[in-house]
Amino acid sequence: KNLADAYSRFFKKQNDKPRFKSKKNPVQSYTTKYTNGNIAIDGNKIKLPKLGWIRFAKSREVEGRILNVTIRRNPSGKYFVSILVETEVQELSKTNSAIGIDVGLKDFAILSNGTTYANPKFFRKLEEKLAKAQRILSRRTKGGSNWNKQRIKVARIHEKITNARNDYLHKISTEIIKNHDIIGIEDLQVSNMLRNHNLAKAISEVSWSQFRTMLEYKAKWY
């Protein structure tokens, strides 16, 4: 499924052709299906095949029938578990509202009713910190212990920026879905815009494609 999704994004010109990961790659993951009770959750513990019961921090309560879990190690060395479940989603009340969305650089999104979602230009201080950390990393000898420590520092700053961006996009996409029955959004060729170096940073930062994806799957949920 992950490979199919990667090729789908590639053919839509949203990313490069998928490449198989080396074992040396700091990002590794695997998915295992639920079979005969091999996956279970009890409080702050999760039972996983071959690992048994281990402690984990839940971001939310897990409801529904477990289908599979994916274990992933991110660039900073942290491990995450994603749990796919089958559950019923309660439909939202009808609002009889239709809305159009324009996205841009000055403001992240402007609705046809005048509602504006500002582009917060996430974490300028973190960006400066990231640039400094990357400069230090470039001066380290690749593969050495000091290089690896600095690589982890860079990865953690990237994580903070990514997490904050995801939180923002989830917040506004959920708000729009809950308040409007029909939603229209312009079709943007982000990959073409990314060829313009002056726009690349801003577009990457506000993540229009990710926002559109969230709207699409949340609309299907409800």
Predicted regions and their residues:
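Positively charged, helix-rich recognition surfaces that bind polyanionic ligands
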Residues: K50, K58-R65, R73-Y222
